[in-house]
Amino acid sequence: MTSILSPEKSQNDQELPLRPSYLQEFVGQQQIKENLSVFIRAAKSRGEHLDHTLFYGPPGLGKTTLAKIISNEIGGNFKSTSGPAILKAADLAAILTNLEKNDVLFIDEIHRLNTSVEEVLYPAMEDFELDIIIGEGPAARSVKINLPQFTLIGATTRLGLLSNPLRDRFGIPMRLNFYNTEELKKVLNRASKLLDIDLTDSGSEEIARRSRGTPRIALRLLRRIRDFAAVNNQLEIDKEIANFGLNRLEVDIIGLDSNDYRYLKFIADNYNGGPVGIETIAAALSEQRDALEETIEPYLIQIGLLQRTPRGRVITATAFEHLKIPLPTSPTHQFNIFNDNE
């Protein structure tokens, strides 16, 4: 799914110059920052490694950035990989044996590790030991290799797909939440100074409130609005040029784009607001289920336009109002049912 509002990382995002290096520079996630500061200081005072840490939550909220900040704060090297990149146990063993004391190993999409790789990871996390099988058949033997004390940081957008044994081995699990408008304004104001952009308070406000609570999206929109300002000979980004650019990008006043409208209108027009199963929606929109669950649905749920129920997806009365579609006479969409993971 391609969209200016996708929270997934893009090769064109070029976030590196904008990434904060230390906790005091990081905007938002205040409780996480405060707790991490305590845990890091305590570990350093004891001369120990920081407990293994798991960041989970929607994409684009700063999981990778926080992992790099932890590495800087504890003074270790930062090694990065991802679950899909570690195909077999030998791949992980090669990474682990090259770690040094206090290094941070960051595994993105850690829920996508296969079982054989996880089994190698367990003793490495608990005892800093690596069990390697040498030889084959009856002559095979297990050799233990001691590893230096390191910190594993995992990141996932799908906590439910993480196996219980792996999840239980993280001493510091932390959920990252969507940002509010004021926090996103701080992110934008910091970035505008680094990018030498003249951003007014009203311009910052306009971009922030349409950024779906996600810093990655806010920074991407800032760069595109900068382009519109430059072509229109605007020396600063104010509310007017921000509104012009965002409308051209088809981002509406609450941060919805054409993909969101397709999703909501499909349920409204074909199922009177739902319930309808996620597989049906994915097939009708020619999208992958994972893309819908990770890119579109979290924000729609966050702002009260969508509910996940045991019977399927249901859009709310607020969604009908935003779509300017009359509310159906059936009260199905108004049921307030517990969320599920369908």
Swiss-Prot record:
Domain writeup: Has 3 domains, the large (RuvB-L) and small ATPase (RuvB-S) domains and the C-terminal head (RuvB-H) domain. The head domain binds DNA, while the ATPase domains jointly bind ATP, ADP or are empty depending on the state of the subunit in the translocation cycle. During a single DNA translocation step the structure of each domain remains the same, but their relative positions change.
Naturally occurring in which organism (per UniProt): Rickettsia bellii (strain OSU 85-389)
Name by which UniProt lists this protein: Holliday junction branch migration complex subunit RuvB
Enzyme Commission (EC) number: 3.6.4.-
Subcellular localization, as worded in the UniProt entry: Cytoplasm
GO CC terms, sorted: cytoplasm; Holliday junction resolvase complex
Entry binding sites for ATP: L18, R19, G60, K63, T64, T65, E126, D127, F128, R169, Y179, R216
Location of region: Head domain (RuvB-H): 253-342
Gene: ruvB
GO biological process: DNA recombination; DNA repair
CDD domains with a match to the protein in the record: AAA
NCBIfam families: PRK00080.1 (NF000868), ruvB (TIGR00635)
Subunit structure: Homohexamer. Forms an RuvA(8)-RuvB(12)-Holliday junction (HJ) complex. HJ DNA is sandwiched between 2 RuvA tetramers; dsDNA enters through RuvA and exits via RuvB. An RuvB hexamer assembles on each DNA strand where it exits the tetramer. Each RuvB hexamer is contacted by two RuvA subunits (via domain III) on 2 adjacent RuvB subunits; this complex drives branch migration. In the full resolvosome a probable DNA-RuvA(4)-RuvB(12)-RuvC(2) complex forms which resolves the HJ.
Region called Large ATPase domain (RuvB-L), residue ranges: 1-179
Residue ranges of the region described as Small ATPAse domain (RuvB-S): 180-250
Gene3D superfamilies: 1.10.8.60, P-loop containing nucleotide triphosphate hydrolases, Winged helix-like DNA-binding domain superfamily/Winged helix DNA-binding domain
Stretches that traverse the bilayer: none
